[in-house]
Design a protein with these regions (language model features):
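Buried hydrophobic positions in well-ordered alpha/beta secondary-structure cores of metabolic enzymes
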Residues: 23, 172-174, 248
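Internal helix-loop-helix
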Residues: 47-135, 187
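A short core secondary-structure module
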Residues: 175, 179-228
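N-terminal-proximal low-complexity accessory segments that begin disordered
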Residues: 1-43
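Structural beta-strand/beta-sheet cores of well-ordered domains, especially the beta-sheet scaffolds
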Residues: 17, 133-135, 168, 186-188, ...
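Gly/Pro-rich turn-and-neighbor structural signature
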Residues: 106-175
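Glycine-rich beta->alpha junctions and the first turn(s) of the following alpha-helix
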Residues: 229-305
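Short, surface-exposed, low-complexity cationic segments
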Residues: 30-49, 183-193
Length: 305
């Protein structure tokens, strides 16, 4: 499929996903004032017709197709340099789609446990790339009492868990919290939040499901106030991104979308793999923020003579 336009991206989010913000059900993100700024920011990642950005934003796949560079597996120093440069220009929606690199990083290890899981990882990466989709890093559980293991909590759903397995797939229940841009992606890529022991096997789960999958609900929050005006909020009026509390209310996931289902020794491998790519984005953001602070300090000193 061809690369999406900004308008096609926004239209693709009108898929019946269940979203809430301040207790209000959001039926259409394209018509919601709360999502106006985040959508404007995220849709710029689809401006492939910008001649100044197109070369950086895209690459040729092994089949010769044009794809977004966020899906490129860096194999040379130049590949990595371009990826890092791209990361400084992307929105949070584009940035967190790097979760597919975390999956690719564990693919060989998980193949030794279950080759089908590795094949599923490859297939979902190719599917998302071919359809120019975006994905969220869905990892942080509610956790509850941090001194207890996942299976020792008073509420068993404080960590996302498998509640049923069948010949067709798994059913999961629980929630993941503080998920950046969850409401504005197409795929929710779920990983364990930490290493798991044998008694916690039901909590050792990884998969990808559509954001509009039955049983998925996303409760949004943001640092940006509900009513923005450029004078009082010069930054938030142009750049903000919500985070979501993603609730999985007995969500069914077919086996072809599952990457881990009870193999507890692999849970920590998944959790650590995400850190490599997530921390890279964090460091790039820290460097940009440091430049802003230095610039502000210079401006203040100049104003004070």
């Amino acid at each position: 499929m061809p690369l999406k336009t900004p308008a096609e991206y926004i239209e693709s989010l009108r898929d019946g996903r269940v979203l809430y913000w301040d207790g209000e059900r959001i039926d259409d993100v394209s018509k919601s004032e709360r999502f106006r700024v985040p959508l404007a920011v995220a849709s710029r990642d689809y401006e492939y017709d910008d001649p100044g950005r197109r070369e950086l934003m895209t690459y040729r796949t092994e089949e010769g197709e044009l794809a977004h560079r966020v899906y490129q597996i860096p194999r040379t120093e130049e590949d990595l340099r371009k990826r890092l440069e791209l990361a400084t220009t992307m929105s949070m929606v584009g940035g967190v789609t790097g979760v597919f690199m975390a999956l690719q990083a564990v693919k060989d290890e998980i193949a030794a446990v279950n080759p089908q899981y590795a094949e599923n990882i490859e297939n979902i990466w190719r599917y998302a790339r071919a359809n120019d989709l975006r994905a969220a890093e869905v990892i942080t559980d509610a956790k509850g009492d941090r001194s207890r293991k996942a299976n020792q909590q008073d509420d068993p759903d404080l960590y996302l868990r498998i509640v049923d397995k069948s010949s067709k797939g798994i059913t999961v229940r629980g929630a993941k919290l503080h998920i950046s841009a969850a409401a504005l992606v197409h795929e929710l890529v779920v990983m364990p939040t930490k290493s798991m022991r044998e008694a916690e096997a039901d909590y050792a789960v990884s998969f990808s499901c559509p954001a509009n999958a039955p049983g998925v609900k996303i409760i949004n929050r943001s640092f940006a106030p509900a009513k923005l005006n450029e004078f009082d909020y010069p930054a938030s009026a142009h750049h903000s991104m919500p985070e979501g509390f993603v609730i999985f209310d007995d969500v069914f996931v077919p086996w072809e979308r599952v990457f881990l289902a009870g193999e507890h020794r692999m849970a920590g491998v998944f959790a650590r793999s995400l850190g490599l790519w997530e921390r890279t984005l964090g460091l790039l953001e820290a460097a940009e923020r440091a430049e802003q602070i230095i610039g502000l300090a210079l401006l203040v000193s100049e104003q004070q003579g």
